[in-house]
Structures are given as C-alpha cells and as structure tokens.
C-alpha cells in the first residue's frame, strides 16, 4: 500500500499532467504546476474519490500546495 504522500503526489501528477519529479511537497498547484481553477476543482474531486472523504469548499480553497493536500488527508483519515 502506498503512503498518503505517494498517493497524493500521483493524483496531482495525473490530474495536472505534470511529471512526477515536478510534484514536490512545496509546489503550488497554480504557480508551480500551472493549474487553473478548473484543474484545482478536479484535483479536489480526485482526492475526495481516492481517499473516500468529502472536502468542503471552504477547506478546498486552502489546499493550494502539495503539502497542504497531504496534511488535509492525513488529518481527515479515520
């Protein structure tokens, strides 16, 4: 089983069409990885599906980096 960090990074790379080497913890989805607002919505939906959780809009707005996504999933896993 992959770690949460590995799973998040894989989803980010797939959703944003970037190389996995570019998906570092400090990377901003918009500034570093070239995501637009639609990309970020789709990314949140993919994270919700992968981790079987619901991310409220107000929380989703705060998930702007790879590390923020990892931290959110870690803190909301049962």
UniProtKB/Swiss-Prot annotation:
Protein name: Acyl carrier protein
GO BP annotation list: lipid A biosynthetic process
Pathway: Lipid metabolism; fatty acid biosynthesis
Transit peptide as UniProt keyword: no
Purpose: Carrier of the growing fatty acid chain in fatty acid biosynthesis.
Location of O-(pantetheine 4'-phosphoryl)serine modifications: 37
Record family assignment: Belongs to the acyl carrier protein (ACP) family.
Species name: Pseudomonas syringae pv. tomato (strain ATCC BAA-871 / DC3000)
PTM section of the record: 4'-phosphopantetheine is transferred from CoA to a specific serine of apo-ACP by AcpS. This modification is essential for activity because fatty acids are bound in thioester linkage to the sulfhydryl of the prosthetic group.
UniProt-listed PROSITE patterns: CARRIER, PHOSPHOPANTETHEINE
Domain Carrier: 2-77
Keywords: Cytoplasm, Fatty acid biosynthesis, Fatty acid metabolism, Lipid biosynthesis, Lipid metabolism, Phosphopantetheine, Phosphoprotein
Pfam families, per the entry: PP-binding
PANTHER family, per the entry: ACYL CARRIER PROTEIN, CARRIER DOMAIN-CONTAINING PROTEIN
GO cellular component: cytosol; membrane
Superkingdom, taxonomy of origin: Bacteria
SMART domains: PKS_PP
Cell compartment(s), UniProt: Cytoplasm
Listed InterPro entries: ACP, ACP-like_sf, PKS_PP-bd, PP-bd_ACP, Ppantetheine_attach_site
UniProt entry tagged with the keyword Phosphoprotein: yes
GO molecular function: acyl binding; acyl carrier activity; phosphopantetheine binding
């Amino acid at each position: 089983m992959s770690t949460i960090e590995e799973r998040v990074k894989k989803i980010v790379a797939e959703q944003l069409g970037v190389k996995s080497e570019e998906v570092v913890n400090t990377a901003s989805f918009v500034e570093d990885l070239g995501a637009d607002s639609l990309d970020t919505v789709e990314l949140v939906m993919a994270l919700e599906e992968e981790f079987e959780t619901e991310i409220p809009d107000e929380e989703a707005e705060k998930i702007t980096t790879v590390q923020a996504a990892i931290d959110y999933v870690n803190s909301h896993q049962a």
